[in-house]
Amino acid sequence: MATVKDSGFEALEKLKATEPPVFLAPSSISEDARSASQYLFMKLKPHNPKCPFDQLSSDGFDAEQIWQQIDMQSQPLLTSLRQEVKRFAKNPEEIRKLGKLALKVSHEDDIDEMDMDGFDSDDVDDEDKEIESNDSEGEDEEEEEEDEEEEEEEEEEEEEEKDGDNEGIEDKFFKIKELEEFLEEGEAEEYGIDHKNKKGVAQRKKQNLSDDEDEEDDDDEEEDVEFDAFAGGDDEETDKLGKARYDDFFGGKKETKMKLKDLSEDEEAEIENKGNEKLSTHERARLKLQSKIEQMEKANLDPKHWTMQGEITAAKRPMNSALEVDLDFEHNARPAPVITEEVTASLEDLIKSRIIEARFDDVQRAPRLPTKGKREAKELDESKSKKGLAEVYEAEYFQKANPAFAPTTHSDELKKEASMLFKKLCLKLDALSHFHFTPKPVIEEMSIPNVSAIAMEEVAPVAVSDAAMLAPEEIFSGKGDIKDESELTQEDRKRRRANKKRKFKAESANEPPKKALDTSTKNP
């Protein structure tokens, strides 16, 4: 076993000394790596009893198989290490015991080597005893140092508490420490005490109050000192009085604090009751009021429960916290009525009354608007056609080839008449709605009379225009008095009839001639 350990340790040191580029090239370093891994596996085997392998098998195995063996050892080893770390975190004192065991194991290994080299076992036992005695002395020293550190920490905490109580009163100009020093100096001057030695007295008192027996002795000594101070004494006694304080003569305002480790809960309660007995009723009331104020301030400053924070979202409250609370929701929709016997009976009565009255209130369907226009009814002529079949085909082809010359239908004539009436209406509306005259629209078929161009102008020269040559009767001729039908003479009736005929002929001449409808039927 010693040879395996030595060879594995040497291989491990060799791997540490090799440079990284050497691993890339094929060399004998793979054998060193395998022996080093075997060495580490054997070292970790005692700490991992759950490992299924006693040793690392590397002969005839490739790198992946070796890594799998190491992985099977490392997984339970990590769990055991975590458990050990947790155990040490709970009990830190076990780390020292573990260190002692490690020292003993190392000493035993050294003893074995010394036995192999020829040393006596008695010498080794003496050395072990010396080491144990040194360890015990070192432990005692460490414990004393720890106790001193704890005492210093407690003193610092007491000073911090005092400073924290006075923070609300102090400011830039007023400080309580300076006030206390000033008062102590005044008291020292009154009683002839040296004020410079007060720090030494405070340290001495703290040392004397560490144990109960020492406290009693110190109280006796202080009483003697007080008696000597009033009675007078030698120079040595005056030096002792120089270290005295005001609290030594008249008693302190606050009780001395003892170690919390040495006091039980009953003793702490007794000390608090003693301190409260010395306080007046006004001071006790102030203490109670101060404690209530502190509790209320703490309640206001501490984060409130999520149920007391008003409107809150799911992201701001703990997970699944709403399952334990009865929440009130505000619904916008009207809740469904609870179905009871009264509700069902009223519904049945309502249905029966509607059936008797035949008042079913069926939903009326909305009328559908026509999506397509009505088809035009074709005009059918039952009369026999006078044209031949060839003429009919010719007329249809001519209509398809020249749609402009297609014969007008009755609907086309109606459309044309409607457009003419609308134009006349628009002309009259334009004349009524404008301050100036609106000219007539351009006539489609315009006749060009044989007249000089200057005479056709709207504003013609005086020499050319005929306005100056016309008589007033020609410019404006009155129609005369309007006569009733019974007042007309025979000549008036003839004249009126001639005017009507003249107008009718003029209108018929301007209108296009109407084509006669073809009443003939087509030949089959």
Curated annotation (Swiss-Prot):
Residues 131-165, 257-302 form a coiled coil. Residues 196-207, 494-504 have a biased composition (Basic residues). Keywords: Coiled coil, Nucleus, Ribonucleoprotein, Ribosome biogenesis, rRNA processing. The keyword Cell membrane does not apply. Residues 169-180, 271-283, 480-493, 505-517 have a biased composition (Basic and acidic residues). A motif (Nuclear localization signal 1) lies at residues 85-92. One of its GO terms (molecular function) is mRNA binding. Residues 109-168, 181-191, 210-238 have a biased composition (Acidic residues). A motif (Nuclear localization signal 2) lies at residues 373-380. It holds the Pfam family Mpp10. It is found in: Nucleus; Nucleus, Nucleolus. It comes from the Eukaryota. Residues 100-243, 259-283, 479-524 are annotated as: Disordered. One of its GO terms (biological process) is rRNA processing. One of its GO terms (cellular component) is Mpp10 complex. Induction: By salt stress. Involved in nucleolar processing of pre-18S ribosomal RNA. Component of the ribosomal small subunit (SSU) processome. Interacts with THAL in the nucleus. PANTHER family: U3 SMALL NUCLEOLAR RIBONUCLEOPROTEIN PROTEIN MPP10. Belongs to the MPP10 family. This is M phase phosphoprotein 10. The lineage of its organism: Eukaryota, Viridiplantae, Streptophyta, Embryophyta, Tracheophyta. The gene is MPP10.
